[in-house]
A protein has these predicted regions:
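Short, solvent-exposed loop/hinge segments that bridge or flank secondary-structure elements
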Residues: 30-82, 141
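Bacterial N-terminal signal peptides that target proteins for export
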Residues: 1-2
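Contiguous, well-ordered beta-strand patches that form the walls/edges
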Residues: 53-55, 78-128
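Beta-sheet ligand-binding and adhesion/scaffold domains
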Residues: 17-34, 103-155
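Small disulfide-bonded, cysteine-rich extracellular recognition modules and tandem repeats
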Residues: 15, 50, 72, 151-154
Length: 155
């Protein structure tokens, strides 16, 4: 009898009784996906890469990143409109998405809500220098602020 009562109560709660509005779909709690203010084609290309922990080291790190252009990190164009990059601690790059957020921040990461643990936040981007930081605290500590300096003018 208790199982029958539980089943009936479960059914009633999904029907929206005593309400003039229909019940929300199960995933309605997720915020709608927002587009990033940076387009994938803006970051595709060859980049010198270095990182820093101390903000005072940023100018020196940009110079070091530029020096890495002889062995550039390549951000590729994905087949589904994203970019091909590495996730933290992954040897194989994969297609990631650029995602916007209600707070105005941009992220790069796998499909899912912006600012998820596997994402990296785009701290700044001016077309020539891209700075990212992993959302995951452990990855952020290990990798620091990643500085990408464009190696050559875009085609």
């Amino acid at each position: 009898m208790i199982s029958t009562l539980a089943a009936l109560l479960g059914a009633c709660s999904g029907m929206g009784l005593m309400s003039s509005t229909p019940s929300a779909p199960p995933d309605a709690g997720m915020a709608p996906e927002m587009p990033a203010t940076i387009r994938p084609d803006e970051i595709v290309g060859k980049w010198g890469l270095a990182s820093y922990q101390n903000p005072a080291d940023r100018p020196r790190t940009e110079v070091q990143a530029k020096a890495q252009c002889k062995q550039p990190y390549v951000i590729g164009a994905g087949t589904s409109g994203g970019v091909v990059m590495h996730l933290a601690d992954q040897a194989t790059p994969e297609e990631l998405r650029l995602k916007g957020s209600q707070g105005g921040k941009n992220y790069i990461g796998p499909p899912g809500p912006a600012g998820s643990e596997q994402d990296r936040e785009i701290v700044s981007f001016d077309g020539r220098v891209l700075i990212t930081r992993f959302v995951d605290k452990d990855a952020a500590t290990r990798y620091g602020n990643m500085v990408y300096v464009r190696c050559a003018p875009r085609a």
